Amino acid sequence: MLGLRDVCFDPMLSSYDYHPISLMSTVPNDREIVQAVVDIWRKDKATEKLGAAKLTGLVKLTHSDWQLSEKRVKTVMKAANLGLNQEKFCYAGSIMSHATPGLDMPEKVTLNIAKNRGKGLYAKKDIKKDEELWNEQAFLLVPPLEHVGIMRKGMGCAFCSRPFQSHNGVECPSCAAKWCDNQCKKKDVTHVAMWHESRHGKVTRVEWRAFEDFCVENGWMALYALGLLWLRVIRDPKKDEVQKQMMAFARVGQDERHKAVEQSNSLFASEQSEVLWKKGYEMLDKLLLDTEFSYEKDFLPGLGMFNINNVDGNMYLTQSHLNHSCEPNVDVKNVGRTQGISVRAKRDIKTGEELFTTYVNPEHQLDDRRYNLRVNWGFNCNCTRCKREEREEMEYLDELVSNWTIEHKRKEMKEEKKERTRTRTRSVHFDKEPEVVA
């Protein structure tokens, strides 16, 4: 939905007809109605939440001579792409996920799968505030795209991308790659496909570099991560388990996620996205010649999977089961590139309570949090905090409308009093001689 700064009232550019305003008119034209509503919104931003009935009432307060119905206000505002409280698109119902195979749960945590809520982690025992529930290393470690250059020059670890402070490091005898230590070297199961010319790995260095360059040029982290993930499926000694675990992550098509972007985005922008997706698919599909990899079933859901599951660009098996609350009871901290994350209790947690993290900055306001969650994770948050703040907002709006009504009535009464005074003054005449009564 358009914001106030997007509204244009130039009659040459307006999408609705403009008619000259008649001073005696009691039926407002579309432009007048839109302007009246926008004036109310500008007076107090909170009024953007008002429904058509209350908004129509406020308009008629300041334009008492207008013949205006709630239905007409709705129609006019919708035509101007300023729909009132129109339902926002959410894609949470399209997200698919499964129980993760081979997952060792932390001692005090259990995994439950509910029909209406999906996967979630719950306290199996009482948990004390600040207690560490678990720590885990990344299932998929994705180097920042800005580190690709230093990795290629041997100035950063070929696995974790950490820049070297000196020229020390474990060198590859066959290429320019270096690792922090033997631990990083051992974990780097995709190295041959990414750096060497060998064909036995099904992917060559030249093909991978072309794909990598495309990701860097377009700043496309999700595509880069998806490429790394499928290289693991091809190269990892435990590739069957890796693929099953990959498919268990919550998944949704990137095209479905894109629908949640505000209506103010143009059709042209959507078409541009689709062109880029198809080019990205072609680049990745070239790497996976002997692998079944489709645009609709693997590529688009793969992009969506990374976007809704990554934490600072990396993916974690256990952490991915945590659901969101704007008042989380656990804290997920990034310990380091190779150390992974640590999950601690923010408060005492009772047995049976669900564990919640936060997907967004809890310092943000209600509207900002909900917008971020709807666009990036597909749902409209109704956690305890959001419901409480929404109630408070509605109470404020009711009070605001009431105060505006009282204020307007006072002004009307004041004007009526002035008019009566003027009328009485005009009715007194001093130009006639008084009559003498016999």
Curated annotation (Swiss-Prot):
DNA damage keyword on record: no
Record Gene3D superfamilies: 1.10.220.160, 6.10.140.2220, SET domain (2.170.270.10)
Enzymatic reactions: L-lysyl-[histone] + S-adenosyl-L-methionine = N(6)-methyl-L-lysyl-[histone] + S-adenosyl-L-homocysteine + H(+)
GO molecular function: histone H4K20 methyltransferase activity
GO cellular component assignments: chromosome; cytoplasm; nucleus
UniProt subcellular location: Nucleus; Chromosome; Cytoplasm
Group of enzyme by EC: transferase
InterPro entries: SET_dom, SET_dom_sf
Record-listed E.C. numbers: 2.1.1.-
Family designation: Belongs to the class V-like SAM-binding methyltransferase superfamily. Histone-lysine methyltransferase family. SET5 subfamily.
Biological role: Histone methyltransferase that monomethylates 'Lys-5', 'Lys-8' and 'Lys-12' of histone H4 (H4K5me1, H4K8me1 and H4K12me1, respectively), thereby controlling gene expression and remodeling chromatin structures.
Identification of the protein by name: Histone-lysine N-methyltransferase SET5
